[in-house]
Amino acid sequence: MPIRISDDLPAADILRSENIFTMSESRASLQNIRPLRVLILNLMPKKIETETQIMRLLSNTPLQVNVELIRVDARASRNTPKEHLDKFYSDFDRVKNQKWDGFVITGAPLGQLPFEDVYYWEKFVEIVEWSRHNVTSTLFLCWAAQAALTYLYGLKKETRGDKLSGIYLHRTHHHHHPLVRGFDDEFWAPLSRFAEFNSEVVSENSDLTIFADAPNAGIYLAASPDCRQVYVTGHPEYDASTLHNEYLRDLEEGLEPKQPVNYYPDNDQNKTPRAIWRSHGNLLYSNWLNYCVYQVTPYDLADLI
């Protein structure tokens, strides 16, 4: 949140020069405040787990956020009770005639499948295109980030033979940008994907700003110049046990996965993992919600272009 100070206070210019978020009294007096409207398109199999993880991060700000959950279609889910979906989820057609402050599109366990072979690919493209004109800022997570980068920029993902699974150390760039304000120079974040995007290729073929990457894992965080599209190729929302559960799932399916790196204490899968990425995840969501959504969204969403 910004600090409200007198227009004439000598400290004002100093704070602004240090990129501290200040707001003049004259601007503050003109602000109208209302709850933010945030939409979540949940593509993950375990929807209750995922919606809880994301809402936990969305709630960690002083802002009031009204959340609505949607699904891509009404197909039956193997991992989420029908009663839960019918009660708490809407179809896209029900919300598409409204405008929204923020939109989160989750990942999906589809990393080895070509995008055009995903049964809801056309619907996904429709939703992404809709979001460009009806949402102040959209946050794409993991598979959704890969899919959106391919659709919006024609960027081709590099599919690895082995899965990137574990906690990876990332480098922060453009430290003074609001999206990464407060980030450490390096931070840990969970990854669970087969795809990666090379930083140099993305820089040369798009207008995206790359805010974080890893030498052995490619881009982690990038955004369009106006931050209306923000891409996260990992899972800052994951609980401490999520990667463990995915690892066990892949073992049961006979996929012979490698043990997640930098995850189990002493590399012993019998020891309880510790979440060393939680503060970064909270800060990322807080910055996105504050600087990319709250500070730029119109009071009357009908004015959103």
From Swiss-Prot:
A Gene Ontology cellular component where this protein is annotated is:
cytoplasm
Example of a GO biological process term: L-methionine biosynthetic process from homoserine via O-succinyl-L-homoserine and cystathionine
Pfam families recorded: HTS
Which EC number(s) does the record attach to this protein?
Answer: 2.3.1.46
Instruction: Please give the SUPFAM superfamilies that the UniProt record associates with this protein.
Output: Class I glutamine amidotransferase-like
Site positions (Important for substrate specificity) are 192
Molecular function (GO) terms for this protein are: homoserine O-acetyltransferase activity; homoserine O-succinyltransferase activity
Site described as Important for acyl-CoA specificity, located at 111
| Principal place of residence | cytoplasm
The catalytic site is made up of 142, 235, 237
Write down the InterPro entries for this protein, in alphabetical order. Answer: Class_I_gatase-like, HST_MetA, MetA_family
| Compartments it resides in | Cytoplasm
Report which reactions are catalysed by this protein: L-homoserine + succinyl-CoA = O-succinyl-L-homoserine + CoA
Write down the superkingdom of origin. Bacteria
Residues where substrate binds = 163, 192, 249
Give the enzyme class: transferase
Keywords associated with the record:
Acyltransferase, Amino-acid biosynthesis, Cytoplasm, Methionine biosynthesis, Transferase
Q: In which pathway does it act?
A: Amino-acid biosynthesis; L-methionine biosynthesis via de novo pathway; O-succinyl-L-homoserine from L-homoserine: step 1/1
- What is the similarity comment for this entry? Belongs to the MetA family.
Function comment: Transfers a succinyl group from succinyl-CoA to L-homoserine, forming succinyl-L-homoserine.
Its name, as the record gives it, is Homoserine O-succinyltransferase
From the UniProt record, report the name of the gene that encodes this protein.
metAS
